[in-house]
């Protein structure tokens, strides 16, 4: 286990665990946050504590020896990918946000919700800020537009399911943890060359550009 006393440090544990699970050695590793909110797990009688880490590795071919596979984080956060312009699911997203804003109990709350949604999702006169990944996820959670928000509520109605924005859910609060990691890496690549931890030994400038764009979720100016 990552936290066993046999490991020399809190970073060596996750490194060894990740390699056993995937066969991949990690380069850059950074501890993020500790997550322990009781309502995030759907279990009222227990608290699950998760210590999260961001680890980078180079892409390699998948091995049948391990029960692991590569996934794009945009499978879980399709609204974060603006490389080809506004995502195709933007209409569903705007509709859900509009209903949440309209359902506010009073004018002040309605105005606050509208301003918050506009700032986080680049609506009205606001520009898209790629670093606000966690804040966008938390807003969608609050607006009950993702499945994780309804866990523990019993059977989910068809109306509620129809309101969900696209994006694969994850167990417990793992999508929230992933959002934290994405936000951290997007901010990190702006002032530290960690992107090279993801690149092969030899690469072209175009490959480097494509990697940065994939992380940032938007095109970069050459």
What residue spans do the PLM features occupy?
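Active-site-adjacent beta-strand/loop module that shapes the phosphate/pyrophosphate-binding cleft
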Residues: 18, 39-64, 182
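Conserved Nudix-box catalytic region and its N-terminal flanking loop in Nudix hydrolases
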Residues: 1-24, 32-37, 188-213
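Hydrophobic, aromatic-enriched interface-forming segments
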Residues: 80-179
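Flexible, glycine-/basic-rich loop-and-beta segments that form/coincide
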Residues: 63-80
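Short, positively charged loop/turn segments that connect secondary-structure elements
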Residues: 213-222
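Short alpha-helical segments that sit at the start of domains
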Residues: 171-191, 202
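Short secondary-structure capping/junction motifs at helix and strand boundaries
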Residues: 24-32, 60-67
């Amino acid at each position: 286990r990552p936290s066993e006393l046999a490991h020399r440090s809190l970073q060596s544990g996750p490194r060894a665990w990740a390699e056993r699970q995937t066969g991949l050695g990690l380069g850059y590793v950074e501890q993020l946050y500790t997550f322990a909110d009781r309502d995030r797990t759907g279990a009222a009688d227990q608290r699950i504590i998760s210590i999260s880490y961001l680890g980078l590795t180079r892409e390699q071919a998948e091995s049948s020896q391990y029960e692991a596979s590569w996934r794009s984080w945009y499978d879980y956060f399709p609204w974060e990918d603006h490389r080809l312009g506004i995502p195709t699911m933007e209409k569903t997203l705007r509709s859900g946000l509009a209903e949440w804003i309209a359902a506010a109990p009073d004018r002040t709350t309605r105005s606050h919700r509208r301003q918050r949604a506009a700032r986080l999702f680049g609506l009205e006169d606001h520009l898209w800020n790629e670093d606000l990944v966690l804040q966008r996820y938390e807003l969608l959670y609050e607006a009950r537009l993702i499945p994780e928000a309804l866990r523990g509520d019993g059977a989910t109605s068809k109306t509620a399911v129809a309101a969900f924005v696209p994006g694969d859910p994850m167990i417990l609060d793992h999508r929230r943890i992933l959002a934290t990691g994405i936000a951290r890496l997007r901010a990190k690549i702006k002032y530290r060359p960690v992107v090279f931890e993801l690149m092969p030994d030899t690469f072209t400038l175009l490959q480097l550009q494509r990697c940065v764009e994939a992380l940032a979720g938007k095109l970069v100016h050459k």
